[in-house]
Amino acid sequence: MTGVQTCALPIFCQTGVITGDLQREAAKHGLLYAGDPSSADSSMIGGNVANNAGGNKAVKYGTTRNQIYSLKVVTPTGDILDAGARLKKCSTGLCLEQLFAGSEGVLGIITEVTVKLRPMPPYTFNMVCVFKTDEEAFALPNKILKAGIDPTSIEFMDNEALRMTCKFLDMKMPHVDEGCDYVIVTVESFSEDDSDRKMEQLCDLAEENGSIDEFEADKRIWKLRKQFAEAARDVDKMFQTEDFVVPLDKIPDITKQIPELREKYDLYCVTVAHIGDGNIHVLPLNAKGLSPEEWFEKIKAFHRDLFPRVYALGGKMSGEHGVGFKKLEEFALCTPEAELNVIKAIKKALDPNNIMNPGKLVQIC
């Protein structure tokens, strides 16, 4: 990192910088880097940009592409490109920095990033709303957003996910043993009065929608949420994580179909979600000890059934993890031909020799 400029609020960094280190450096100056993937303490900013990582604060601040001013990129043909600029607005040419954000490394090598920083809100609370049913929990986020509470995060953990992660961390949390789900809501404010008002408003709204308890959580709640993937890996080294995304008003429609799919394919699944932006992680776990070949065939069949349902609701198969090679076949099946042709044309124009991450995102051979 080459320094924070507090006037225009950028910070310049090379792509190997750990996301959590970037967050902590900004915080030293009373500033916030809003990109916050659950892997912040291990993921690098270059990977965040290339994958357009989302994370816990995307409800308020957007994904990684919303956090960048500019990129330095080495193209497949050896040119060095400065894409974007440290400007608040620009209508000059194409937004090339946005082309490379989320491109999964197939268009060039990102070497430097100029990211946006924001003033750090001095007041923050984390509220856990406890629900007995998934349906009640999934109905809350849209109502929070419509109420004008302006949350930073709205996260969901079902009871299976809570039990698994609490066991992994040897942690006790309220109502987990009662079979309940959590909706975790973070709200940032610049005044104590505003924070208090929003806390009261949130509690009232949660109770109106079936919450059996609301409690202000300490930092353990984010440890619980962010260690979920490690807990899953402890149970099943071959675990698969889905991260499909649907419009907010379609969350109840798709989540009602998950139990049907679980039963149809005889899958044990746990679910967490960045539910405030419609990004849902359903993790099938190989609880019955199938061979790798049997397991991956079952997951492929599950995908072939799940993704068309997601697209029928106006969603996409990935909200933040990307396509890579694991979802390459399904991406080609679900994506309109005109869209695929544009992606292939861009890839061929920038990488005529197909040397950048071949076989990922799109197949051009």
Please give the residue ranges for each predicted region.
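Single conserved hydrophobic/aromatic residue that forms the stacking wall/gate
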Residues: M1-C7
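FAD-binding subdomain of flavoenzyme oxidoreductases
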Residues: A8-E155
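Activity-critical C-terminal alpha-helical subdomain
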Residues: D79, L328-C365
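Conserved, mostly hydrophobic/aromatic
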Residues: G105, V282, D351
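C-terminal substrate-recognition/cap domain of FAD-linked oxidoreductases
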Residues: V115, P119, V128-T133, F138-D305, ...
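Small/polar glycine-rich anion-binding or flexible loop at a beta-alpha turn
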Residues: E160, I275-G278, M317, G322-E329
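C-terminal polymerase-core module
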Residues: R233, K237, F244, F325-E339
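Alpha-helix capping/hinge segments and adjacent helical runs
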Residues: Y311-V323, K348, P352-M356
